[in-house]
Amino acid sequence: KFFMESTVPIPPVRAATDLIQPEEPAVKPAVAPSMKAFLELAFRPLYLGGIGWAVVAIALWVYAPALLTAPLGGIAWHAHEMLWGFIATIALAFLMTAGANWTGINPMSGKVLILACILWALARIGFLLPYEAAFWVAAASELTFFLLGSVAMLRAVIKSKNSRNYAVPFMLAALGGADALYLLTARSGDYLLLMQHFNVGLLIMALIALLIGRRVIPFFAMRAIPGLSLPKQTETGWVQLAACALGALGILLAQPLAVIVGLGLAGVLALVQIITWKPLA
């Protein structure tokens, strides 16, 4: 009887519907790609365009050089597209994007960025076509592209009163100026003068690379290593700018001593900057 009758009440069994049911976590719907967002920063379309063009240009140069019969053809086309068609384009896109952080004003976006992309694409196509008119349309488009970037950056630094970056728009203008000299010389057939102007453009591009390096190397190093403090090298940067300008003028005016002094000083300052950035930290 003890085993048959229990005085402890047995709780009723809850229905399955009364139990707590697990629920899937709410997933927010993915945001659809937006053309407006794509055109907010210059690096998005211009990086893609530059990389795509690099692949096409290398393929043409390696596998189909016979097709390069345009007024700007052969080695002149190859050198031009390597420097101004690709490297300078990527640099301009970076400076437009970084300029938004440096000044708090986005220099190039929306319709202005669309115009810049169209000008850049017209130049790439025009320099491939075997017509004199196409060459001049391409040249005008490319020079307007660099002028547009220079003016956009100048507007941002003036409006924000960002004196630290006053030199940037003039670097872009100088890059476009060297491009103009190169293109004009390409039509004259003077190869030595052509390479002289190419070297000026290459030196200006190296100066822009030094500027970018002075900004991003300390920034990312201090973010990666807690407690690391690195100088901004603003003063040496201005001296480096003047030294590179002296070197560029020396190339244009065929003054070897000015080239040696300018580039030598710029190189020494670059070594000083690297050492003060504590590469072994």
PLM regions and their residue ranges:
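Hydrophobic alpha-helical transmembrane segments of multi-pass integral membrane proteins
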Residues: F2-A281
